[in-house]
């Protein structure tokens, strides 16, 4: 499903929750009747007041990637590293080796699985497991924007939830009993599978009922500067280019090839003449300037002039 301007009607009053410091994952909508609670370094989410069944609780643009790319993103991004459980040493306090080991642990503790890939969230990963949950997650993979495939997670209430009640979801009939906590539900695997199947069916049905509202939120987000930047960062990660605080901080061989190809293509240098493959700060700056000009065409005049100056210096 493509996102186009036809979904933009009556959206100017829709609140869009955003955190510009998070460069890979974004909460697009958060129900105002929930709050986050932290105790002994563990987080949970509670209701402030009653939430009726069938309500949208959270809508989140999530990060989907293979295991290697996912842990490299966490390892090289300060916000995601410090946010993810277990929160022991801070990003700035870790050696490179220790940060790599912790990133692997954080990935296993905070991700969902989808089609063999890892799915990283910011808000939904704070919600604890219950084999009889009061909320359900729907993973929406039907959107693309500018040729970029993007995945959203939707969280809905499936019961009337009283005030001051913990929000819970099911991690799955098996996974929910394998994580680093003890489930005391006492239910058999067969019972858990039956409940999980019902919950999944409810989440799909409620998502369909809320489809128009969700499309409007997604349109506002994907056409915003923040949404475009995060989609770009997702794309760069698939190429082996990793961002922290708006700067390229790590590059794989594939990433270096992507940077060289774009810069040399813009400079109209023939492949036979591309002798200098070294990634320099100057080349990275040129790469990011070209990308910015494509992503934000309204600023393209200034960006184009900057690239021209770089070409002349080169």
UniProtKB/Swiss-Prot annotation:
Record keywords: Methyltransferase, S-adenosyl-L-methionine, Transferase
Protein name per Swiss-Prot or TrEMBL: Putative SET domain-containing protein L222
Taxon lineage: Viruses, Varidnaviria, Bamfordvirae, Nucleocytoviricota, Megaviricetes
Pfam families assigned to the protein according to its UniProt record, in alphabetical order: SET
Species whose genome carries this gene: Acanthamoeba polyphaga mimivirus
Gene Ontology biological process terms, A to Z: methylation
SUPFAM superfamilies in the record: SET domain
Listed InterPro entries: SET_dom (IPR001214), SET_dom_sf (IPR046341)
Spans through the membrane: none
Broadest EC class assigned to this enzyme: transferase
Protein origin, superkingdom: Viruses
């Amino acid at each position: 499903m493509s996102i186009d301007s036809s979904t933009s009607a009556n959206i100017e009053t829709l609140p869009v929750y955003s955190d510009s410091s998070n460069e890979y994952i974004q909460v697009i909508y958060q129900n105002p009747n929930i709050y986050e609670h932290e105790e002994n370094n563990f987080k949970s989410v509670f209701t402030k007041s009653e939430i009726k069944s069938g309500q949208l609780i959270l809508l989140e643009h999530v990060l989907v990637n293979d295991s290697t790319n996912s842990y490299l993103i966490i390892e090289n991004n300060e916000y995601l590293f410090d946010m993810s459980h277990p929160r022991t040493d801070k990003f700035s306090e870790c050696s490179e080796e220790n940060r790599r080991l912790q990133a692997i642990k954080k990935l296993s503790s905070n991700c969902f699985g989808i089609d063999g890939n890892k799915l990283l969230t910011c808000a939904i990963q704070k919600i604890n497991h219950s084999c009889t949950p009061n909320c359900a997650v729907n993973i929406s993979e039907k959107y693309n924007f500018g040729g970029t495939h993007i995945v959203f997670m939707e969280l809905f209430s499936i019961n009337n939830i009283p005030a001051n009640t913990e929000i819970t979801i099911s991690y799955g009939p098996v996974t929910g009993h394998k994580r680093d906590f003890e489930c005391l539900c006492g239910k058999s695997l067969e019972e858990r599978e039956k409940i999980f199947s019902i919950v999944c069916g409810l989440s799909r049905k409620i998502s369909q009922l809320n489809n128009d509202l969700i499309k409007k939120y997604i349109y506002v987000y994907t056409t915003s500067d923040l949404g475009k930047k995060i989609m770009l960062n997702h794309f760069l990660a698939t190429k082996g280019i990793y961002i922290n605080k708006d700067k390229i901080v790590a590059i794989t061989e594939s990433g270096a090839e992507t940077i060289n190809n774009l810069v040399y293509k813009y400079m109209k240098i023939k492949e036979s003449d591309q002798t200098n493959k070294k990634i320099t700060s100057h080349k990275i700056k040129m790469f990011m300037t070209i990308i910015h000009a494509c992503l934000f065409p309204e600023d393209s005049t200034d960006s184009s002039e900057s690239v021209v100056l770089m070409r002349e210096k080169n």
